[in-house]
Amino acid sequence: MTQYNVTGMSCAACVARVEKAVSKIDGVNSCSVSLLTNSMNVDGSADSSAIIKAVQNAGYGASLKGKEKKSADVEDSLKDTETPKIRKRLIASLIVLAVLMYFSMGHMMCGLPLPSFFDNNHIAMGLVQLILSGIVMVINQKFFVSGFKGIIRLAPNMDTLVALGSGTAFVYSTIALFMMTDAQVRGDLAAVMSYMHEFYFESAAMILALITVGKMLEAHSKGKTTDALKGLMKLAPKTATIVVDGAEKTVPIEQVKKGDIFAVRPGESIPVDGVVIDGESAVNESALTGESVPVDKLIGDTVSAATINQSGYIRCEATRIGEDTTLSQIIKMVSDASATKAPIAKIADRVSGVFVPAVITIAVITAIVWLLLGQSVGFSLARAISVLVISCPCALGLATPVAIMVGNGVGAKNGILFKNAVSLETAGRIDTVVLDKTGTVTKGEPAVTDIVTVENISETELLKTAVALEKSSEHPLAKAIVVYANDRHIIGDAVTEFNAVTGNGLTAKIGSESVYGGNYRYISQFAEILSDEKAKAEQLAEEGKTPLYFCKGNKFLGIIAVADIIKEDGKQAVNELKNMGVRVVMLTGDNEKTAKAVAKNADIDEVVAGVLPDGKEKNVKELKKYGKVAMVVDCINDEPALTSADLGIAIGAGTDVAIDAADVVLVKSRLADVPATIRLGRATLRNIHENLFWAFIYNVIGIPLAMGAFINLFGWQLNPMFGAAAMSLSSFCVVTNALRLNFVKVHSSKHDRKIKHKNKKENKTMEKTMKIEGMMCPHCEATVKKTLESIDGVESAEVSHEKGSAVLTMSKNVEDSVLKKAVEDAGYKVN
């Protein structure tokens, strides 16, 4: 995808013209132009010079953006250079317009005195209005230059409508002035007064002034849509304190190199990404993650640019600088996403391509019809001019991109990063969320959940023995016990003769006494385990936990249960999704017992266990038949499933936000950010619908009103000046409505509503993979296949004796024990 800057566009018709011109070039696969960011994305092998030439031939300017878009370049592109220019034009226009209105209407409506020179000097009055309105037109010559260029190139735009409306009023008034001069020479005072009433000089000037008012309001509001992005850029520190030969010195941020040591005092911003090498502190990372609670940082922990050091003094080694920092990557992602086009924008694009020519045609027909009905030339032209100036393709062109821009900004402030506009729109349509278990629903690291001691043995004594034994082990379950004990300041005794017995447990000596830890089969060899303790252990296992038994000598001490526990916000997030009408499914490669236990704790109703990575992809594709599916994972191991879903969400990215396979990147490891993503997507989609409705309904009502269609029914007719005022406000209203997205609370479920789906056949199919030993030939495959497919709930079985596996497609959940028994009864072994 190659990006270009495009200049000279004023409305949606310009966008359609540029896209049409570029799409005709050989080698261009797709072209997307954004009116809001004045940018163009082109996919294909076409030469950039050919693309730039095509844009120029269409009447616009184009230049190639740098391959590596620097944050400084993005910041420059977001600077509001348009509003100050428009403001100057507007002030000059209003000053001249005030004088014009004084001469044309002030003396009649307000009784303001005119210089005696103008008494009965109608020609002088007309000439003054001609000159003053001409000055306003010169001040706003941009409309005429752009508008008439569009006509010459057969690509009329919004400026064309304004130029035709104002120009027609001016030309007609000038002709009326000449006719009045002739009448005055002939002494026909009645004709003089009649022609005086045909002057529309003030309308010609007022149209330009009011359109300029609207353009300024629009430019100001458009600037507000990028506030979130600008806010991120302002966070980037300009200087850093680096340590050289033990001395600290402040340098510009550009001089910091990878590997430099930098110091950060309390209250200062961290200048670049790095790792703490000295000291400890609490860092506020809300700028990047939206999380206001400070995060403790110790030696070895990573820190990110633009986060705030709140307490201690720390020294860090720079690991990412310049455009590689997390902040710069986030800025680039938000900027790139805002420059892309959502599929829903195609509605406006199709209309915009024919909108301006259609309006010009309607205006001409309007004038002709009123003339044929016997109305005066002035009346007929007034109706045609009203049609020209009230029609607004700008609102259509801005309806989608402004909402996308604001939505992306809101997401960035909350640690939700969308790769493009398509991702944001798709998030609003999601009705099924597939969750990976490990690291997504659960924390991804084992933790102690239960401690069961025998009579006369305290928890402290059990933990002391357990930690003494486990601290020498590298097993994840051992680490969980050590962390648990350390948190409670329990230190185990030193051990000797430590030995890890593969598949069973651990053994060592404390002093002269042997201690053991491991599974039931191993520990029961050394100590008697009562039935009550064994029953408790089995109950813990049913809950998806791993019971570890410990004994000292031949005395059984107790059980410590360890499990990968669900995240604190896991249950709440799942319930929020359900309340939003979203179907939640958990896919995991773990065994069914563990998966069901985790799902029960997280309130997840649908579970598919024992699924290999390629099986996850198949399940996701199956679910896509029934709706829009989002796949949520915490790592790239599930990339096939991530890319096969309608929306791939990577959770807990931290500083690695540039994950190619994901459509949405969640910086924090919070499951609550998943419903927040969908909530934001829905709010943005709803806002786009509102904008498109307003843009369409405005023209649907406004154009017939301007034509005079309601004059005979209600006596309603629209003065061209009021038409210009309405046009100037239409785009402003669309942009202002988009700004309301800034008030969306993405983590609040207060206003959640269940989405209404079309009646769909409920999808109950799931896949499961079994490992089977003993199959030697196709005959064995057929036997196993027939056996499995005879089980109620198994729709089909793909069996391979070469792979030693069977992939089952099931219409309902079937217990592993049932499947295992059937296969083993047929003479084969299930692993």
Q: Model segments located where?
A:
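Juxtamembrane coupling segments of multi-pass membrane pumps/enzymes
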Residues: 2, 74, 183, 189-191, ...
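Conserved cytosolic catalytic loops of P-type ATPases
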Residues: 26-49, 53, 198-199, 230-324, ...
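Membrane-embedded alpha-helical bundles of multi-pass transporters
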Residues: 109-123, 152, 156, 171, ...
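P-type ATPase nucleotide-binding
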Residues: 448, 452-580, 592, 604-620
